[in-house]
Amino acid sequence: MVLAGLLLHYSLRVFVCDSFVVNGVSMEPVLHSGERVWVNKLKMGARIYADYNFSKPKLSSFRLPGFSKVNVGDLVISNYPYAKSHDTITFKINYVYLKRCYGAPGDTVRIVDGYYLHPQTGGRIGDLTYQKKLSECSDSLLAEDGVVIKALQVNKSLNWTIRNFGPLYVPRKGDSVKIGVDTYKTWRRPILFETGERLYVRDGQVFLGEKPISLYTFRSDWYFLGGDNVLNSKDSRYIGLFPESYIIGIVI
C-alpha cells in the first residue's frame, strides 16, 4: 500500500500537477515570495525527460499530448535558460522561474511607455501596478532605486529599454525569418540552441556554421516571459526568449 501510494503521488506530480513555492518579488503584487502555486501539466502536456543525465547542457525531453497551448496572460513555471551562460541556452533542473507569458509563438511583443501591449488587441496586459510606476517615473529616479533601464540589445541602433521595447517577433515552429547583418544577433541564441551551430558575420555575409544563410526556419516554439513587477524582474526583456521545451506547466 505504501509503495502504491508513493507511485501514485509521484505519477500525479509528473503527469498531472505539481506545486512550487514563489521565490522573490518579480511577480508582485499578484504573487508574493513564500506563496505556493499549483501547476497544471495536463493542459499543454507533461514534459517527460528522455535522458536523466542532467549534467548535460541541453535538455533531452518530449512532451505528451495536451489540450491547449500557453496563451498570452498565462502564468507559467519554466526552467531558466541562461543559468550557466548569458550567451548560450543551457538546462539546469533545479533553477525554475515563475513568469507571465507576454508573447506566445507567432506574436510580436511591444512595450510602449512602460506598458506591455497585447499582441492582438494592442491593449495593455498584465498587472498594471508596476507598469504604471515605470511609465511615470524618470530614468534617473528609477536608476537611483537600482532599476536597470537598458534592455536586451539585439541591435545597438535600436537602443531598447524596459520602457520602450520591440517590436520583437516571437518565433513559431515552421516560421521563417530573414537573417542579415543587422538582424542576426536577434536570433543567435535560439538558432544555436536548435542547431548547435553559431551565427556569425564574415566578409559582410552571415554564416551558420560554415554555410552562408539568409533565411532560417524555426524548429520549435518560443515564448516571451516577464514578471509583473517590471521594476524588479530578470526576464525576457533582459535575457531573451524561452524555448517551449523548458516550460514545465501553466499555473492554475
Give the location of each predicted region.
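Extended hydrophobic leader/signal-anchor segments used for secretion and membrane insertion
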Residues: 1-252
